[in-house]
């Protein structure tokens, strides 16, 4: 049994978003209270839900007197941070290394033991990301008995880990900022970008989506969700001002709102990317501002059921080929069979975590920040029924530094592929740059700099490389740099010499970059910041019609099977991601369509 000096102690550890602090009160031999006092973790991943660890872990530590708490799948880093910070506080209270080791090995809360089970409901939704939540809400509002099956211990899917951006077309937020935009302008932009490298775009589905972009935003902002829990603890979380709960009739309510509108890229007009609360420029962690209110509304206000930690295995059909339900496996191995009277909606996400599926693209050694469960299982399950899975010739890939963020902002110095060749106007939308690198057959990019460009990330990366504090190569010559990069010195030297010539002339004859972004690279030290491929959104997916029904190659539909979100092929991508906000916006819209179609409601 551990021995402590009675009192209250502080501890800290690094979480997903930064340092996390706890306050622990102990008696001589017990942990009496644990409170997370400060953190920078993300809403919808670490906190804000009925299942997130910042709400659950402190009381479990106290109740079971253990640091051996089961991980909330999807929030692994936050779970570890709470336990490590608590251990640090206990050490300050006098616990020995042996005491801490014993607490980490102490009996964990017993996992629920589920029997094999067979149930019948109206609608089964597989996946609780943006598309699945929107579908479930629409079906529930129509009076259907709905169950969501979710692999993780939290909702949100890839949306919760995203920057939380949404696409709009002439919205009230754009007008407030004096921005002129129309649905036709957005439609033309999407079709132009998507068809630059081939005829990939589905005109009818894109028209349908764009015509309802603003309605989707209005629907999302209209939802008021009940927040449960002790009000003092709830309000102690790091809420963004726009989503901070307010009391209505004795109940705390939260909702989604748009903070502001930002450009797709500084080179592109008009501005049409709508930011979640949390501010513009973010590339991850703010998407929980979208998924959390949807989850709370579905669970707390509509009484909807989510079966967590449960993976869909197989889609069931009758003799005529109509879908009748799914089989699933719970954590622990219990089998769950769910029959669906009205239909099954697949919202299982993409396949960015399936290395075999991504292997056909030139993105070897890629990384991804999407949930580990995004392995394309919805695609393969539907394919077994004869569904058409369109294997698109591209995925969303952005080449970015893992240490300084260069590649995802507006840096516009010299970028080369892994052979040392310049292949693009660097002052372009990041996905245009990435698409050019990928299409050149390169599985990485390099940002060549002498640290003089006016970009914080570049200067940070340059200084770290010069000081030997990073793995990015540094050399006194371009030839020496090329050797460290692993490319042909003559090729990189020729590229560098040509670039310097264009800088001197003030005209980019090769790729048309504006003169003010032709930054000189003169040494005395040269650094190459490695840009790694990051895969997030995957293109293609199950062919669906305008009602979100899953189709076969012959154009017929599979009765009672629907798809929304990344698993669905919405016909809206070419070889590059057109703009932030496209994926979440289409997931919400076609999720709503699926939820309405499966319950025989009029479409939007």
Place the predicted regions along the sequence by residue.
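Conserved redox-cofactor binding core of oxidoreductases
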Residues: 208-334, 503-523
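A glycine-rich dinucleotide-binding beta-alpha-beta segment and adjacent secondary-structure elements
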Residues: 39, 314, 491-575
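Glycine-rich FAD pyrophosphate-binding loop
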Residues: 141-162
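Glycine-rich active-site loop/strand segments that organize a redox cofactor
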Residues: 63-67, 168-209
């Amino acid at each position: 049994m551990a021995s402590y000096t009675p009192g209250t102690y502080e501890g800290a550890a690094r979480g997903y978003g930064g340092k996390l602090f706890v306050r622990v009160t102990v008696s001589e031999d017990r942990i009496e209270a644990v409170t997370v006092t400060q953190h920078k973790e993300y809403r919808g991943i670490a906190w804000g839900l009925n299942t997130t660890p910042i709400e659950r872990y402190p009381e479990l530590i106290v109740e079971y007197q253990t640091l051996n708490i089961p991980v909330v799948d999807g929030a692994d880093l936050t779970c570890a941070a709470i336990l490590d910070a608590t251990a640090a506080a206990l050490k300050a209270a006098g616990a020995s290394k042996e005491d801490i080791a014993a607490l980490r090995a102490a009996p964990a809360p017993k996992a629920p033991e589920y029997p094999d089970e067979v149930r019948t409901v109206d609608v089964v939704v597989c996946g609780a990301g943006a598309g699945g939540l929107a579908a479930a809400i629409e079906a529930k509002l129509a009076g259907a008995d709905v169950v969501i099956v979710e692999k993780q211990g939290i909702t949100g899917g890839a949306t919760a880990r995203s920057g939380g951006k949404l696409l709009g077309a002439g919205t009230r937020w754009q007008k407030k900022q004096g921005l002129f935009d129309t649905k036709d302008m957005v439609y033309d932009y999407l079709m132009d970008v998507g068809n630059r490298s081939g005829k990939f775009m589905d005109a009818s589905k894109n028209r349908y989506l764009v015509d309802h972009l603003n309605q989707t935003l209005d629907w999302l902002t209209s939802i008021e969700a009940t927040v449960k829990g002790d009000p003092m603890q709830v309000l102690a979380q790091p809420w963004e001002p726009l989503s901070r709960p307010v009391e209505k009739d004795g109940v705390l309510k939260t909702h989604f709102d748009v903070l502001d509108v930002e450009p797709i890229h500084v080179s592109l007009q008009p501005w049409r990317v709508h930011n979640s609360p949390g501010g513009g420029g973010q590339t991850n962690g703010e998407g929980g501002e979208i998924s959390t209110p949807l989850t709370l509304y579905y669970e707390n206000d509509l009484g909807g059921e989510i079966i967590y930690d449960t993976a869909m295995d197989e889609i069931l059909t009758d003799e005529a080929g109509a879908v009748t339900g799914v089989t699933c496996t719970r954590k622990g191995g219990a089998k769950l069979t769910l029959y669906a009277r009205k239909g099954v909606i697949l919202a299982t996400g993409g396949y960015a975590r399936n290395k075999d599926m991504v292997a056909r693209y030139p993105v070897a050694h890629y990384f991804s920040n999407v949930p580990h469960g995004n392995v394309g299982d919805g695609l393969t399950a539907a394919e077994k029924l004869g569904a058409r899975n369109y294997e698109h010739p591209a995925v969303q890939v952005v080449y970015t530094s893992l240490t300084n963020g260069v590649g995802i902002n507006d840096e516009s110095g010299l970028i080369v592929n892994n052979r040392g060749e310049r292949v693009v106007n660097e002052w372009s939308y990041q996905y245009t740059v990435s698409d050019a690198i990928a299409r050149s057959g390169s599985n990485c990019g390099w940002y060549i700099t002498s640290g003089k460009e006016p970009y914080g990330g570049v200067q940070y990366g340059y200084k770290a490389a010069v000081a030997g504090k990073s793995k990015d190569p540094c050399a006194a010559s371009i030839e020496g740099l090329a050797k460290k990069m692993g490319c042909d010195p003559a090729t990189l030297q020729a590229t560098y010499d040509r670039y310097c010539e264009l800088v001197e002339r003030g005209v980019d004859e090769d790729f048309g970059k504006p003169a003010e972004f032709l930054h000189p690279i003169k040494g005395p030290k040269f650094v190459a910041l490695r840009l790694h491929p990051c895969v997030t959104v995957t293109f293609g997916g199950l062919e669906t019609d305008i009602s979100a029904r899953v189709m076969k190659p012959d154009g017929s539909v599979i009765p009672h099977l629907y798809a929304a979100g990344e698993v669905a092929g919405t016909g809206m991508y070419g070889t590059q991601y057109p703009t932030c906000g496209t994926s979440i916006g289409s997931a919400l819209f076609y999720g709503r369509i699926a939820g309405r179609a499966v319950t025989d409601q009029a479409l939007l």
